[in-house]
């Protein structure tokens, strides 16, 4: 079935009509059992549950109202999202607030969206209701425990009709930036279908932009994050690919599960952030893979954070004995503001690593080098599904090839803006290029906030502009420094710049596991790590480390999507709140 721009519930209705008894979604719950408890919905079952829940939602909300989804990863989460769209209500996928702790992010989103409905589950409702306060002049939102409803009953004829008039906004995707003022990206139907078309072109173009029979989506990524949401919830429906899903907890408990799922599902397509590739490489044992073969994997997308060359090599080497084809690994670039996807290399090519002169990168020049000691960067390919330009963020003038600037994006996939933040929307989504080159529109352009460059037509990414370390007047990418550290210590680490006496100094924070060893052995091991890291950073980046902080795993603050909160690291360091292993 070809998908033209219609609606997500409309496509689901078609699938329920033409392939009612085919498997749609399978969720494996590893929290109920270590071996996993499976629940499967066919297309007709998924559609029936969607219709029944949508009918309930219409009793509590009107077109354009917001429904917050604060529920565990489950099939009910998927049903909650599609039912919101079916009812003409703007869906807001979120993570569950942490029990026993005040969750500023959840409070901020409630205040920002003034929801009419909160969709949750009986297992977490006590946590959720703490945040359900009516906004001034409004009623408190209706709290619906989806798992307590009978959604398998025959839908009434009235429930089959779509909402009268759909809002321009389908859903709000809250970014994982500031906890106090999270920004809700407004995604429209046009954005979603444009990005779906781009995704199918880039990842299934060799099959005529259609998933071949036998294809499967495999995902453990959280539904509240843009990559997990599109991969695990949107793509299966629009592309008609059955999905096998689990939760982030299922993966983190035992990373080998992800690789086993890839091997046991045909033509598997999956995605994960860079750290997950490291974790799977280190935590998957040969006995976990006994009798399994990865030769049939269609694609493993590495995205959400900058892809590290050392991670790719480690992952490919680890699973080569199990027939993993390096060409299946797809480093990819995207963000919620572009719906999710922006760039990847063409299918049929293994990841490409290019060395650049480390002395020139801090001065904004990207020059390829063949010599040892270059800075390795991953290519994201030639972008051809949307427009990408490298621009001077201060002047709005395009930068020539081989010159570092801000990555700007233009296409129908670029979202409407930030919910109720007109100034931030104007600043981020309405940028204009001064004296644009031929074939380049003046605007509007999305300012990604990412620094990068084009070399021989290919896109390379340096990192977040706001995270750049400016030491002695030169720009250094924290991602590059962290990649150097991880060649010595593969755990999580953070490179930050801290102001002292009017100058920026480099501080590295490294998570290390404690071992069963004597105090003398521990001191020797920690001293070795410090010496090796200090030497490697000096050699690779020409920088001296002012302070190297060794901490226990879990000490470095991260976002809900696993990215390092560097600004929070700086504050923790200033307040001397890191507990040092070598204190």
Curated annotation (Swiss-Prot):
Membrane topology value: Multi-pass membrane protein
Compartment list: Cell membrane
GO molecular function: adenylyltransferase activity; ligase activity
Keyword Phosphoprotein annotated: no
GO cellular component: plasma membrane
Keywords of this entry: Cell membrane, Fatty acid metabolism, Ligase, Lipid metabolism, Membrane, Transmembrane, Transmembrane helix
Location of the region described as Disordered in the Swiss-Prot/TrEMBL record: 353-375
Superkingdom to which the source organism belongs: Bacteria
Main location: membrane
Keyword Ribonucleoprotein: no
Single GO biological process annotation from the record: fatty acid biosynthetic process
Ranges annotated as spanning the membrane: 77-97, 109-129, 229-249
CDD domains xref list: FAAL
EC number: 6.2.1.-
NCBIfam families associated with the record: PRK05850.1
Similarity field: Belongs to the ATP-dependent AMP-binding enzyme family.
UniProt name for this protein: Putative fatty-acid--CoA ligase fadD25
